[in-house]
Amino acid sequence: GHTGLGITRQYRDGSLLNPRLWVMPVTPYGNYATFEEFQDFNVPKAEVIDWYRSMVDFGLTYNTARLVYAHPPGAYEWLDVTRNFIAYGNSKGANRFRWYTIERLADFMAKRDQVRWSQTPLPTGALQVVASHPSSLAEMVWSVPKDRYLKPTSVTGATVSDGGAFWLVKARAVGTLRFQLKPNPNYRPA
């Protein structure tokens, strides 16, 4: 099953029947996923609050999205927990944490699926990365591990920012981007 995964594809008997369809599996807390279930099975509110906070932290740590599901009547009955969850997510800052609808994530994934990119070794030992999209690469980001590569150079169609352990190569609203990656001389494979 897909339970707990990020946005993914739906395969039936090993076949991708609808390549335009994206699915967003629910992420449960153990056996339960809704406020009604938490209430029916006496899951303490403090545990649910901790779980919601850990979901936000997981999303930030792994740069991913997970679906947390709630029926409106159940959310209303647990309004204190709902408000705590929303406040915790918002407290992380809009530049680090965002709320998305399933539709918005599916649109992004469909756009991402159209990105074509390649990396070519250069005689200098660097890698040349080239990416393209039929309409725009806007919103696309390449995470480059700093321990393995120096700051990307010869960048066109993108900006480079410091993402902690990664260089973030963020595409502009262009059809094609390029950048070069030079190996970090201090890199030691594990």
Predicted regions mapped to residue ranges:
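C-terminal beta-strand-rich structural cap/linker in extracellular carbohydrate-active enzymes
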Residues: 138, 163-190
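Active-site-adjacent pocket scaffolds in enzyme catalytic domains
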Residues: 1-59, 108
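Residues that flank catalytic or metal-binding motifs in active/ligand-binding sites
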Residues: 20, 64, 138
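Small-residue (G/S/T/A) turn/hinge positions that recur once per unit in extracellular repeat modules
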Residues: 155-159
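C-terminal domain-boundary segment and adjacent tail
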Residues: 4-6, 46-134, 148
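Surface-exposed beta-strand/loop patches in extracellular or lumenal glycoproteins
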Residues: 132-151, 179
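A residue-level signal for beta-strand positions that form part of recognition/binding surfaces
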Residues: 20-21, 126, 176
